[in-house]
Curated annotation (Swiss-Prot):
Belongs to the nuclear hormone receptor family. NR5 subfamily. This is Nuclear hormone receptor FTZ-F1. SUPFAM superfamilies: Glucocorticoid receptor-like (DNA-binding domain), Nuclear receptor ligand-binding domain. It comes from Bombyx mori. Its main location: nucleus. The gene is FTZ-F1. A zinc finger (NR C4-type) spans 89-109, 125-149. Residues 227-296 are annotated as: Disordered. One of its GO terms (cellular component) is RNA polymerase II transcription regulator complex. CDD domains: NR_DBD_Lrh-1_like, NR_LBD_Ftz-F1_like.
Amino acid sequence: MHEDAPKMSIAQSLAASTSQPKGDIVTEIPLEFAMSSMETKSIETTNVELKITYVDPTTGTGGEPGAYLPTAGTVCDQTDTKDVIEELCPVCGDKVSGYHYGLLTCESCKGFFKRTVQNKKVYTCVAERACHIDKTQRKRCPFCRFQKCLDVGMKLEAVRADRMRGGRNKFGPMYKRDRARKLQMMRQRQIAVQTLRGSLGDGGLVLGFGSPYTAVSVKQEIQIPQVSSLTSSPESSPGPALLGAQPQPPQPPPPPTHDKWEAHSPHSASPDAFTFDTQSNTAATPSSTAEATSTETLRVSPMIREFVQTVDDREWQNALFGLLQSQTYNQCEVDLFELMCKVLDQNLFSQVDWARNTVFFKYLKVDDQMKLLQDSWSVMLVLDHLHQRMHNGLPDETTLHNGQKFDLLCLGLLGVPSLADHFNELQNKLAELKFDVPDYICVKFMLLLNPEVRGIVNVKCVREGYQTVQAALLDYTLTCYPTIQDKFGKLVMVVPEIHALAARGEEHLYQRHCAGQAPTQTLLMEMLHAKRKS
């Protein structure tokens, strides 16, 4: 079955979006000429300031696009105030009115909780005790609403039994500690963002190309979760309830009971399935899942939402298993290494197709696009497999139609099974950091938009795209994972380890190719040769 993959170069793949209309006569162009001369339509560039929303600690104002980070002074010099952070009710997402029964909640949920406890009401759920609770439908199922009140930390013992106004005010010290923690977190977030802005120059972040994100707001609505845990947890570490209220990445589902991981796996985190909640977390309670739905959606910047929409895991699965099935149908035995090369080649075409449609990459000329892809293709493939294993439960192997076992882990290692232990250690590190889909797609953009790649012409656009994604990821990690110390920095430190795995895999593939053991005239082999020519 030594049939070659389609003879299509990376330049031809990238130029597909600007190809001539059907019916025109197209002359074949030599590979070297095509790679050096083809380019996309020239686009007029403009400098557009990236509007990172800033909330003034002294007033609590700002927040609309156009409120820029201050250019002078430090955040630490600002005074404390009651309204530094806009709060959202952890039960329904409505505006918080104050501390009620051990937690910051809205007036509606406060009254509902008090009436339920004082009147000793007993509710039933007509559905499956997993009703979605938000501002618009919080009255539909009182059972699930009350359960969610308890889950997020509202205290039964704080409700007065005599039905008089006012609660049992034994939580005062806790409220003060929580306010101090909240202000400290806000300072750390603003200092980190301003430090990043300062490292990029006094001019702030500037987009050097037309972009739909000319007014990206990366301000996040922060609800400090489960303050009642402070009564029983040390000040230096959040309690279990606090950790439970943090956004959790989808947990890998249990391994399939059969050997074959079907292409229609229900664990796919496709854009339709991934709505910034923990739908894939099989250990999550219904109420915690509903809480994530109502609060975490508000924490994610529009740019990261748009990035996540480019992740199509369903298509990734269909392409992978569709190719494995088609290549082994009515075959007694196949060369598994050659099959792996065909899968990698298909993955590369998918990488090119994904990249050329992304907001930053598509404005570059084809020469620059080629150089960026030639530098990053292998590390992005390794990252993709980490993502599939962590978020979609991709198993280590699958059984082909002819009964042979295909090593999916080895596929992610580019054919070097001896790197499996290192790969698993890397996966464990990411799991400890609660590596989720927004993290994954931002890191992937940062791998692609590497301004240090030699030979690129429009370094300015590449660097600005990289810095924009970097700033969005920093803001996301500080906002959604405040309890993970320096999550952003630790993610950045993991990147060289992914590069090391990819480099070992590349070298292995190149050696096999030189020994005549791999298909020729494929995009995979073109990539391997291109990096050695640069």
